[in-house]
Curated annotation (Swiss-Prot):
PANTHER family: 40-2-3 PROTEIN-RELATED (PTHR21038), UAP56-INTERACTING FACTOR (PTHR21038:SF2)
Molecular function GO terms recorded: mRNA binding
Cross-referenced InterPro entries: FYTTD1 (IPR009782)
Annotated GO CC locations: nuclear speck; nucleoplasm
GO BP, sorted A to Z: mRNA export from nucleus
Residue span of motif UAP56-binding motif: 11-29
Main location: nucleus
Family according to the record: Belongs to the UIF family.
Taxonomic lineage of the native organism: Eukaryota, Metazoa, Chordata, Craniata, Vertebrata
Record's keyword terms, sorted: mRNA transport, Nucleus, RNA-binding, Transport
Keyword Transport part of the UniProt annotation: yes
UniProt-recorded name of the protein: UAP56-interacting factor
Subcellular localization(s) per the UniProt record: Nucleus, Nucleoplasm; Nucleus speckle
């Protein structure tokens, strides 16, 4: 880096000075610059960029600046164009780079469909079609059916019978109701709710006095004898396993000892067993 000719004399003077003197001289020049209202002794011109950070121009630096290596295309090229004229040391942080002012043209392009109010045809025509009306009608009909079913089961567990009926005029007005059972649904307050309670003290009809026939699987077959399970009869004879004698264990072991002694004496063994 080569300094300008205007500052050449100052550089030559500083060569002959000691390090302490150079530091003192630089401090004095800085104090004078701040006292004079921002006058700079060096050749750099300072200004404040749009992100609020200070940036120095390279007027005092002579020589050729090297360009960017490689070929940038696409999004990388757009980023480079947005940073054009900004030093790499003074570029804004990522939080400011992604602000509204940085990518406003690209965001405007992506949000174009939202601003113009483009909606898919299926979603746009859904509420204006007969399918939406029929589906919402079926949904309300289904909730009413479920409510009536829950009410019927509640009464049935407590010994009550529930039956909800509808007028025929209502069925003609809503043809969708013909598919469902009319006794389950009641769409308005004109429905009739019939509740029947069992009364044992009331007079029974002749048809109800007859006893109910027993179910066929509950009837027992007459004359059925218990079956003998098939198998081989097991006769266990304890005498075949062991002979019952009146000899005690001590007598039995004594006999065995005597047998061993007699066998050893007959063979002429050198070992003598002491009983």
């Amino acid at each position: 880096m080569v300094p300008q000719t205007a500052n050449m004399n100052e550089v030559i003077d500083k060569i002959d000075m000691s390090l302490d003197d150079i530091i003192k001289l630089n401090k004095e020049q800085q104090n004078k610059a701040t006292f004079n209202g921002g006058a700079r002794t060096n050749s750099f011109q300072w200004f404040q960029n749009k992100w609020g950070s200070r940036q120095a121009t390279d007027n005092g630096i002579q020589g050729r600046k090297n360009g960017m290596f490689g070929v940038k295309t696409g999004l990388a090229l757009r980023k480079m164009n947005s940073w054009k004229g900004v030093s790499p040391l003074n570029r804004p942080p990522l939080s400011l780079r992604n602000s509204e002012g940085q990518w406003s043209p690209f965001r405007r392009r992506t949000n174009l469909s939202r601003r113009l109010g483009f909606v898919p045809s299926l979603k746009r025509n859904y509420f204006h079609s007969s399918y939406a009306q029929a589906s919402t009608f079926r949904r309300g009909l289904r909730t009413n059916q479920q409510r009536d079913q829950r009410q019927a089961t509640y009464f049935q567990k407590r010994g009550l019978k529930v039956q909800a009926t509808m007028d025929m005029e209502q069925l003609e007005e809503f043809p969708e109701l013909k598919r469902a059972h009319p006794w389950r649904t009641s769409m308005n307050s004109g429905g009739i709710l019939t509740v029947s309670i069992d009364n044992p003290t009331a007079a029974l009809l002749p048809s109800t006095r007859l006893p109910r026939p027993t179910l066929p699987f509950l009837l027992k077959k007459e004359g059925s004898e218990p079956k003998i399970p098939k198998g081989v009869p097991l006769d266990f004879d304890i005498n075949s396993v062991v002979k019952q004698t009146g000899i005690t264990l001590n007598e039995r072991f004594k006999i065995l000892k005597e047998q061993r002694l007699s066998q050893s004496m007959s063979k002429g063994s050198r070992f003598v067993t002491v009983g």
